[in-house]
Each structure stands twice: as C-alpha cells, then as structure tokens.
Design a protein with these regions (language model features):
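Short alpha-helical segments that sit at the start of domains
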Residues: 1-16, 41-44, 63, 73
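Short, locally clustered residues in the helix-turn-helix/winged-helix DNA-binding domain
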Residues: 18-22
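Short acidic, hydrophobic short linear motifs in intrinsically disordered regions
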Residues: 24-34
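Residues that mark the N-terminal boundary/hinge immediately upstream of a DNA-recognition element
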Residues: 27, 66-68
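Short amphipathic alpha-helical interaction segments
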Residues: 36-51, 62
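Short, Lys/Arg-rich nucleic-acid/phosphate-binding segment
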Residues: 59-65
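Short, amphipathic alpha-helical interaction segments positioned at domain boundaries
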Residues: 69-79
Length: 79
C-alpha cells in the first residue's frame, strides 16, 4: 500500500460536504436544500462525515481542509 489514505465519498457525501462551509454554521435543512436532499438525509450524512473527521461537531467544514485538483472526492489537510 503506497501513498496517503484518502476517504472515498459517495455522491451524496460529496454534495453534502460541498453544502457545508468553514465560515459559518448551516442547519441540516439548509444543507439538505443546497445538496438536493431531505433534511433528515443531510443530518445522517453530516453525522457520517463527522465520524470520518470531515466536518466538525457543529456541521462546519474544518478550516484548513482544501479541495485538490483531484476533485470533491479527495481532500487533503494543508500544513
């Protein structure tokens, strides 16, 4: 196994992650609206992303995570 581990996200995970923002907190209803899914689906996806450490407890994206040239599936922590 070579290289760093990168989380593999489903299309729904990627849409919900794009709907979150590092600057301010959004409700599950707003995230669901932006991601094109129901609020309860967005909430369960946010919980799954929180377990994977891709979103904070308040639903915000961590400040130092940036999208890379590989797209929405791969996120890297920048030093």
């Amino acid at each position: 196994m070579s290289g760093a581990w990168r989380p593999q996200l489903s299309a729904l995970d990627a849409r919900v992650l794009r709907a979150t923002d590092a600057r301010y907190e959004r409700s599950p209803e707003k995230v669901g609206e932006l991601a094109g899914c129901a609020a309860d689906v967005a909430l369960s996806t946010l919980r799954r992303l929180r377990i994977a450490c891709l979103v904070e407890d308040d639903g915000e994206r961590p400040q130092r995570w940036l999208r890379t040239h590989r797209g929405d599936v791969a996120l890297e922590l920048q030093p």
